[in-house]
Amino acid sequence: MAPLLGDNFPEIEVVTTHGRMKLPEAFKGKWFVLFSHPADFTPVCTTEFVAFQNRYDEFRKLNCELIGLSIDQVFSHIKWIEWIKEKLDIEIEFPVIADDTGRVAEMLGLIHPAKGTNTVRAVFIVDPEAVIRAVIYYPQELGRNMDEILRAVKALQVSDQNGVAMPANWPNNELVGDAVIIPPPISEAEAKERLEKAKAGDISCYDWWFCYKKI
């Protein structure tokens, strides 16, 4: 069974374009995004690799690393990365897992039989404790949105640091702007206290169960 939200990322040793690596140990103390792609030398995957590389510094500023994966041999990865450098003048700096036997893909649930035998476009967001915090799947015909993946990483970090929840489209929510959601109270006393804080201007509330604040 593929790992689910809240599970620890499985311990695996992989072959990559940067040599052998042990996951999640290689990224100990960091967030990391593992993303799978269907195949090397394909147009949509090429646009994604360029997009990930162009935003790589933004990920690293969030203490987050990137690592790709597909069921291709490491030689294919290397030649494709060379092609991207030669033709598009983009140097791919993050490692790419060569899962030519499909072992890692099977372990992580990256092959969806109804969509073929290649890996789907999956995204695993893993925190510094090696806990899987988000999983996103895209079909082969749809490339990923870097803004959303970066937003998810940053939002999870803000949530962890402040004990809050993040609204839709944060930080540009239609109701609360760039504010964050205070988790609903779990007792009558806490609900009353919440409304008193709202009256005092410490927080804002639409109702006792829907309160938010700036951070």
Swiss-Prot record:
Organism (species): Archaeoglobus fulgidus (strain ATCC 49558 / DSM 4304 / JCM 9628 / NBRC 100126 / VC-16)
Statement: the UniProt record of this protein carries the keyword Cytoplasm: yes
Biological process terms in GO annotation: cell redox homeostasis; cellular response to stress; hydrogen peroxide catabolic process; response to oxidative stress
Pfam families (UniProt xref): 1-cysPrx_C (PF10417), AhpC-TSA (PF00578)
Intrachain disulfide bonds: 205-211
Keywords, sorted A to Z: Antioxidant, Cytoplasm, Disulfide bond, Oxidoreductase, Peroxidase, Redox-active center
Annotated InterPro entries: AhpC/TSA, Peroxiredoxin, Peroxiredoxin_AhpC-typ, Peroxiredoxin_C, Peroxiredoxin_TDXH, PRX_1cys, Thioredoxin-like_sf, Thioredoxin_domain
CDD domains assigned: PRX_1cys
Major subcellular site: cytoplasm
GO cellular component: cytosol
Compartmental location: Cytoplasm
Reactions this protein catalyses: a hydroperoxide + [thioredoxin]-dithiol = an alcohol + [thioredoxin]-disulfide + H2O
Enzyme class, broadest EC rank: oxidoreductase
Domain Thioredoxin as annotated: residue spans: 3-158
Protein family according to the UniProt entry: Belongs to the peroxiredoxin family. Prx6 subfamily.
Name by which UniProt lists this protein: Peroxiredoxin
Its EC number(s): 1.11.1.24
Quaternary structure and interacting proteins, as annotated: Homodecamer. Pentamer of dimers that assemble into a ring structure.
Molecular functions (GO terms): thioredoxin peroxidase activity
Function description: Thiol-specific peroxidase that catalyzes the reduction of hydrogen peroxide and organic hydroperoxides to water and alcohols, respectively. Plays a role in cell protection against oxidative stress by detoxifying peroxides.
Residues annotated as the enzyme's active site: 45 (cysteine sulfenic acid (-soh) intermediate)
Residues reported in the UniProt entry to bind substrate: 121
Other known facts: The active site is a conserved redox-active cysteine residue, the peroxidatic cysteine (C(P)), which makes the nucleophilic attack on the peroxide substrate. The peroxide oxidizes the C(P)-SH to cysteine sulfenic acid (C(P)-SOH), which then reacts with another cysteine residue, the resolving cysteine (C(R)), to form a disulfide bridge. The disulfide is subsequently reduced by an appropriate electron donor to complete the catalytic cycle.
